[in-house]
């Protein structure tokens, strides 16, 4: 068994020249941070994780973690796979380590506040300690100021920060003020300040000379794990359990007085804990590493790097530049960004231009027709501004690329509408754009104008009937159709070639209200995919298909491919960037956000004011520009693309992975994009399901979506065929998901149905489930087991998309961990594994309206009516384990007369049992082998592979074991330690027809590892 890739907690991170070095389990990863290229992955320790790194100016790396320490050359780390031979084991836990001033020795700080001075072979030369102190340390660093000046900064578990001189072994200060353990301490390079963070969520700044507390910084909402000084000791950067990275200014008001002031907050990791942080001072770039395995680069000069990121003007400022005077209550009522700058309109019809080159405002013209509720739109790529009012007047202005000239203007009135309350525009084809007008009168038509891009003349006019409760909010075009978003999560599709054709209406697309954006995504054959967002946080991907009819041209149909909900407040729109990542934007309270939904991190944020805000977001060459009015000032905020890659690793879940499932390969799948690997799902304690893809050869994982439908930690997820997946969790949540992977750019996944719950406020957990498909049908039988010992059997009907309960009962009063259907001969058996250590078998053949095909084992539907029946008594019970049976797998023999059952338990045991039907179909269940100490802790997963001849097990002791089965007996053939903590889930891709073929193992827990066997 060999490692292919690993994603898990990254505990430390350091910049070194053009590299970023990160501690990933027992490995160190080296990246070129300018290109986000992983240069090498080198193993430093046998078992322990790398907790900290120190780098010498000569290219040596000092790494430590738990009791392990090693010194290696950077050149070797860049080229070699393993350097574990250099690992040395210390007698005590190491909390900090660094090189001496001349780089000829190292200092190791242990958890007992002792320092070991070692040579470069890690041999101890001297031991230093502080007399009279018996503190246990949670953290600590050693700060080297010179050959004879070395300070030890010890963060104790009892809330004190002890600073002592290494060579004189004398105490300098015991800084008291924190409540709870000290998680990190740091000293400024100039020797003036000490900064500490702790369990109490505060950062405290101390004067090193006097020991006086200078300032307390409150901002983090959870424990703070790490901090450091940067920018000539004028700033602090801190990272926390709250997944934010925060920057603090140290404001010196007078001598020996300094204040901590929060400067920036970056939401950069998932769910729980950022562990490491470092700053490259000369470029002002930070890197963070977290529990989710992400390595995130942060541009600390996001608001200053280009010099024109933030601009604002009052109406007086604009008036001075224009040489014009605005009326007392006049205000800006609309604005649009173009290649040259901004075009804006005031409440009295004054049209203004702001040049992004000269930074000057100019009054272009005044049109008093547009002093009545003006609406501003534009075709940004063509520099065409569109103004409308509530009296159905339209003004079009086309500018030259440099805005020096107005090329064309056109003004017209629409007689078809008595009043207008909304105007929308969208690009159409190479020669024209579309403009739609809506009247508040429900009896009046919805008007769509096709307008020439060259002379701004109306080329054609379309008047459509409006559906009931129609209120247009967004618009896009596709071929000869327009798609109009409306309130009540409604989408209306009009055919521009036939005004008399009834519109195609999609109602209640999501539970939210106003549709905020519609974007074309991709198409294939006769189908096209659109992204639809909703202000209440929902986004949906729909597939529109043209179905040819014998009579008439075609008929439209739609299907929801993907649905999800943002957790960021109001959602105003979304788009895909050049990397294929889904970017969303909107408002959370008064904060505007730009968010990478694919990889789950914030790109930018801006405080924008209240709910009735006037704003606009536009694309520019190297980013976006946000325009908004706040406190009567017009603000321009340019959000540039980062000068460095956003991430070096995207990571996985923020908390442990409970289950993994690989999608079986479909014989009908014609998409070649996923042929080098597999689509798979991970279900996590963080309540989310991630849909991703891994490459078979490299093990590289790409995430596509993070589903948030569950409200509690996941228990199980399982693909039941190549297009359906089931997930379960607490609160009796069980969802049936449908996968669509026919499109070229990404797969999609949406909920098809939810299992009915027993009560409105259930707290039961669905521990496991299994399905049995009905032959030549999409229908299946589903068995679910619950934490209160309940067993339920359901019939899913595909054509009705409905779960019907057909059987229920209880085992005893203990929790049920696992369940499987086993079809032997013509009998359908249900096997459960409860917490009492037994295997329990039920024969339900006579109680379900199906029979079993003895050859294939599939169910045969006899179209019989089913009533809810009680679960029959067990036909066999076998005590296999002393306590809970945590894993269950089986393989039936070729004749389907018996099955081999594998169990792993809380008692560290591994059991092999034989389930058999005799000639009279009586069930016998016997243990064929049991290994009492198959692991040193709970066996969490076990899988039979190679037709039941081999076994792979995972256990909490972080050891993966491979076993062989010979004549019904288990024998250990291989074992290897994994760096995934809380090892719980296992999934294997293998070819049972070829025993010698390579097998791919996915191992989940706190992290994800991909192995080959």
From Swiss-Prot:
> Which Gene Ontology cellular component annotation is one that this UniProt entry carries?
cytoplasm
What are the coiled-coil residue ranges?
A: none
Q: What Gene3D superfamilies has UniProt attached to this entry?
A: YVTN repeat-like/Quinoprotein amine dehydrogenase (2.130.10.10)
Work out whether the entry's keyword set contains Cytoplasm.
yes
Entry-linked InterPro entries: tRNA_Anticodon_Mtase-Reg, WD40/YVTN_repeat-like_dom_sf, WD40_repeat_CS, WD40_repeat_dom_sf, WD40_rpt
Recorded GO MF terms: enzyme regulator activity; tRNA binding
Please state where this protein is localized.
Answer: Cytoplasm; Endosome
Null mutant: what phenotype? Answer: Increases Ty1 mobility 31-fold. Slow cell population growth. Simultaneous knockout of TRM732 leads to activation of the general control amino acid (GAAC) response and severely decreases cell population growth.
WD repeat placement = 5-41, 45-84, 132-174, 177-216, 219-258, 269-308, 465-504, 586-625, 652-702, 709-747, 761-804, 811-852, 880-928, 934-973, 975-1013
Q: Where is this region: Interacts with TRM7?
A: 48-223, 658-938
Q: Which GO terms describe its biological process?
A: endocytic recycling; tRNA methylation; tRNA nucleoside ribose methylation; wobble position ribose methylation
Keyword annotations for this protein?
Cytoplasm, Endosome, Repeat, tRNA processing, WD repeat
- What this chain does, per the record? Together with methyltransferase TRM7, methylates the 2'-O-ribose of nucleotides at position 34 of the anticodon loop of substrate tRNAs. Required for the correct positioning of the substrate tRNA for methylation. Also plays a role in the regulation of the retromer complex and is required for the recycling of plasma membrane proteins like CAN1 and MUP1 from endosomes. Involved in regulation of Ty1 transposition.
PANTHER family, per database record: WD REPEAT PROTEIN (PTHR14344), WD REPEAT-CONTAINING PROTEIN 6 (PTHR14344:SF3)
Note the subunit structure. Interacts with TRM7; the interaction is direct, and required for 2'-O-methylation of position 34 in substrate tRNAs. Interacts with RRT2.
Tell me what else is known: Present with 3450 molecules/cell in log phase SD medium.
Give the family this protein belongs to, as stated in its UniProt record: Belongs to the WD repeat WDR6 family.
- Protein name per Swiss-Prot or TrEMBL: tRNA (34-2'-O)-methyltransferase regulator RTT10
Q: Which organism is it from?
A: Saccharomyces cerevisiae (strain ATCC 204508 / S288c)
Lineage runs: Eukaryota, Fungi, Dikarya, Ascomycota, Saccharomycotina
